[in-house]
């Protein structure tokens, strides 16, 4: 690896420089520094980042009057980050008070604290590390210091953000090979690289592949569409190393399986791969080899197939899934994020649903793999925003004299990326949608759930709004009605006003599906065309409880559960509520039975599977049955309690798929509730009576809402039913589908008219 800039610095210090803000020694206690000198006359330091402070204090003890050469990979002219090179020199023993800033030509020198510093001396013979704490007062000190400088390094209002930018440059690297320079800045994974034709996307990916160490990866894999379709390359043996390793393991496992292996393996490679294929609803599975050839064998609908029999999309998904499984099973010694996966336009053959399968798999591996993809497909860029992808533009550098150099910069959104690859022909404006829900409680829940599941910078933003009116507005309507009744009932104006008031009370209740439908109809009554879509008319969606299952309609989407409360009544949410709240309950409380038999928090976290959590909650609810029924005096609710407890003991169980692809079995009552009306509300109100957090029903209801919502917010996303993510995705993508459908209908109508004419 070659470095971009070299400095030679002597020890002369100008006298007219402003004092540098000191850092309190007590905030950064002394640490041991070790330096090995390779040359008694010159020390060469290779930096990924210039951390200055006590480091130079130690250097001076060794260097005395010798010349020090700093060699760094940070470019002199860097318009992307507007970075100036910096160094601080220590003149006296008490460096905290007398530190000076040395200014060179076109260079400014600063000091600030980085949480992780790694400095390689010469050829990585020795490493010096420091881990100082962050200093919240540094922002103020630095801002005062910058005000005294004659030449301002960067015009920014928020100096703390400026230092964050400098910190990110620590990840910048320079690839220099055969006269091809690539400047890479801080990257966030997974990511898409886009570029115009001729810029060098493929060349860039191959350079990264051959220099994977620059992105701190021990292993890199490069795949393009040709390699995926043929399961070979024939040009670069290094690029097909993964295929060779995979086939070797596949053949070895196949041979062991024919020997009735009983001790060497507990799981064959096809078992692991088939689990992933099945969880993603792919129609084929991998079989053991017949040992007569090196070819992969598959099964689809009881028919044996070879790799070349699969469709191009099936090949793409198989290769990616096989790769992920292979490295998880065979390279467990490689730490997280030390495997780099480079995918060069491999997704172009996939339709939208298959793209979601691919991106969802990548999303789930975001903590285990660094994944870089290149594409020119606007559909890929749009869908990837739902799965946490970042977007980077590869372009030729204007700041580096070599015309064969390129640089990468991050794009703000998937809309920018789509506009770029389409040369401005496509303009995407669905970055946010207004979603009407039935009441304030729905709005709070969906807001929390959406942020938990889609906390990405480039995804469609959903804004949830209660479609009903406020309590005081409903009260005002009632008061107006009472006044009107006292007036002359024969007056036609009074009758008209009374009729209007009644209509408002019916359609603008405090929440409810009628309010949602009315609001959506009112705001989305125009026909959905390409023009109206750009104007935002199709950006308003209604999200309704399942209720009687008759809520679907224009701009309306129904959740899979009877009501949102069903998500909060989930046994997994109740488990975390018990974990968080019941352990704090005093022994004399009516909850003492659960308290005394509940494992410690640590035991709950480490020993219970998701299915065990369900069983745990049901067991604890049953323990409270007698006590709860004895407390209840209302006849109707005594009957409801009987129905509830009969329901949780039922052997009729429903499969619930979770975010981590696990499937748990729960009693039907947790999915559909019970009772002729208000099924979800009946379930929640039953839990209110069982847990009885307050002194009365109203207080207990409010407290249970708060506690279940807190438990939902704090628990892992792995425990959320996957149908909730699917519902949000329906909302995000609704407008695009409507435009397509309506445009097709319009075209069909036009064609019909032409035929008639």
Swiss-Prot record:
Organism (species): Dictyostelium discoideum (Social amoeba)
Name the record gives this protein: Uncharacterized protein DDB_G0284767
InterPro entries listed in its UniProt record: ATPase_AAA_core, P-loop_NTPase
Listed SUPFAM superfamilies: P-loop containing nucleoside triphosphate hydrolases
Single Gene Ontology MF annotation: ATP binding
């Amino acid at each position: 690896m070659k470095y971009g800039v070299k400095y030679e610095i002597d020890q002369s210090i100008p006298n007219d420089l402003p004092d540098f803000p000191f850092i309190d020694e007590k905030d950064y206690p002394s640490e041991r520094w070790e330096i090995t000198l390779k040359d008694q006359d010159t020390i060469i330091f290779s930096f990924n980042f210039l951390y200055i402070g006590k480091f130079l204090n130690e250097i001076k003890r060794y260097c005395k009057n010798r010349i020090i050469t700093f060699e760094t990979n940070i470019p002199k002219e860097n318009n992307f980050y507007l970075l100036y090179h910096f160094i601080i020199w220590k003149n006296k023993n008490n460096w905290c008070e007398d530190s000076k800033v040395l200014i060179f030509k076109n260079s400014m020198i600063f000091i600030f604290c980085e949480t992780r510093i790694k400095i390689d001396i010469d050829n990585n013979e020795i490493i010096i590390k420091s881990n100082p704490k962050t200093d919240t007062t540094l922002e103020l000190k630095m801002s005062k210091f910058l005000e005294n400088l004659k030449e301002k390094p960067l015009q920014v209002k928020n100096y703390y953000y400026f230092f964050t930018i400098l910190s990110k440059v620590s990840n910048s690297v320079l690839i220099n090979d055969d006269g091809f320079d690539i400047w890479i800045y801080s990257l966030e994974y997974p990511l898409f690289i886009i570029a115009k034709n001729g810029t060098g996307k493929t060349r860039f990916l191959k350079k990264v592949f051959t220099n994977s160490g620059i992105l701190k990866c021990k292993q890199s894999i490069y795949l393009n569409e040709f390699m995926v379709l043929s399961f070979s390359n024939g040009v670069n043996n290094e690029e097909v190393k993964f295929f060779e390793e995979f086939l070797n393991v596949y053949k070895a496992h196949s041979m062991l399986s024919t020997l009735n292996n009983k001790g060497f393996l507990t799981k064959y490679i096809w078992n692991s791969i088939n689990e992933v294929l099945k969880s993603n609803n792919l129609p084929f599975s991998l079989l053991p080899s017949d040992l007569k050839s090196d070819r992969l064998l598959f099964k689809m609908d009881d028919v044996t197939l070879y790799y070349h029999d699969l469709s191009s999309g099936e090949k793409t998904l198989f290769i990616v899934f096989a790769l992920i499984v292979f490295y998880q099973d065979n390279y467990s010694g490689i730490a997280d994020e030390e495997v780099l996966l480079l995918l060069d336009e491999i997704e172009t053959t996939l339709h939208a649903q298959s793209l979601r399968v691919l991106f969802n798999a990548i999303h789930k591996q975001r903590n285990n793999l660094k994944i870089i993809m290149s594409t020119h497909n606007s559909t890929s860029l749009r869908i990837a925003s739902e799965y946490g992808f970042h977007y980077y533009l590869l372009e030729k550098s204007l700041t580096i004299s070599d015309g064969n150099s390129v640089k990468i910069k991050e794009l703000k959104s998937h809309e920018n990326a789509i506009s770029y690859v389409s040369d401005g022909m496509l303009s995407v404006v669905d970055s946010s949608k207004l979603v009407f829900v039935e009441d304030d409680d729905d709005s709070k829940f969906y807001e929390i759930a959406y942020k938990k599941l889609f906390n990405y910078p480039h995804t469609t933003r959903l804004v949830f709004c209660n479609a009903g009116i406020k309590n005081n507005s409903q009260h005002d309507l009632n008061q107006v009605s009472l006044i009107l009744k006292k007036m002359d009932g024969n007056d036609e104006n009074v009758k008209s006003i009374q009729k209007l008031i009644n209509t408002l009370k019916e359609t603008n209740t405090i929440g409810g599906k009628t309010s949602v439908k009315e609001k959506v109809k009112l705001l989305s009554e125009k026909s959905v065309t390409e023009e109206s879509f750009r104007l935002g008319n199709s950006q308003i969606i209604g999200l309704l409880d399942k209720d009687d299952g008759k809520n679907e309609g224009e701009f309306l989407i129904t959740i899979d559960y009877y009501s949102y409360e069903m998500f909060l009544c989930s046994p997994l949410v109740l488990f975390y509520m018990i974990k968080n709240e019941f352990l704090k309950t005093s022994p004399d409380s009516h909850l003492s039975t659960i308290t005394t038999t509940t494992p410690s928090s640590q035991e709950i976290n480490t020993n219970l599977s998701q299915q065990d959590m369900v069983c745990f909650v049901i067991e604890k609810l049953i323990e409270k049955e007698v006590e709860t029924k004895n407390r209840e005096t209302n006849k109707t609710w005594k009957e409801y309690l009987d129905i509830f407890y009969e329901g949780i003991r039922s052997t009729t169980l429903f499969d619930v798929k979770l975010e981590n692809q696990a499937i748990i079995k729960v009693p039907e009552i947790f999915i559909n509730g019970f009772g002729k009306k208000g099924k979800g509300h009946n379930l929640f109100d039953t839990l209110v009576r069982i847990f009885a957090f307050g002194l009365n029903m109203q207080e207990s209801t409010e407290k249970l809402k708060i506690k279940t919502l807190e438990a939902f917010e704090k628990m892992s996303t792995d425990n959320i039913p996957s149908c909730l993510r699917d519902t949000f995705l329906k909302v995000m993508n609704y407008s695009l589908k409507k435009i397509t459908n309506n445009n097709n209908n319009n075209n069909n109508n036009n064609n019909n008219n032409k035929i008639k004419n």
